[in-house]
Amino acid sequence: SGELVAFDQRFESAGTQRMFAYGGPVIGAIEGGKLLVIDELDRSLHPLLARFIVRLMHNPAVSTKAAQLWITTHDTTLLDTDLLRRDQIWFVEKEEHQASRLYPLSDFKPRKSEALEWGYLKGRYGGIPFVSEPRFDGSR
């Protein structure tokens, strides 16, 4: 019908609210050529929207002042060399006494054709949680 209808933002999904919350900081970083740091970019955000933000920040036609984006994420779909260079992808791994170690994907020298998401989920690059399978037979 072409009629505009207003919605109260609190009735929007968590992902929609998060996308609106990122709008100002993303635009500010792009316009000012600044660094934008987002912890857990993927929290309540659809993977395609996370990719959109990364692509937007890396698009030289949009980000003409060399804005930078640093994110933490659990979204393995972002492990994509069409989206990020290998030297832009870093992992964090817990060490003894709960210290965290940060290291780049480029340390592993993956082939250009390598499926990074698959390699990460298989443990090739580390940075994955150690989870034991639950036992339901009463044994430990």
Task: Annotate each language-model stretch with its function.
Residues 51-140:
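C-terminal lobe/lid and adjacent interdomain/linker elements of RecA-like ASCE P-loop ATPase modules
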Residues 18-19, 33-34, 68:
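Conserved active-site beta-strand-loop modules that form the wall/rim of enzyme catalytic pockets
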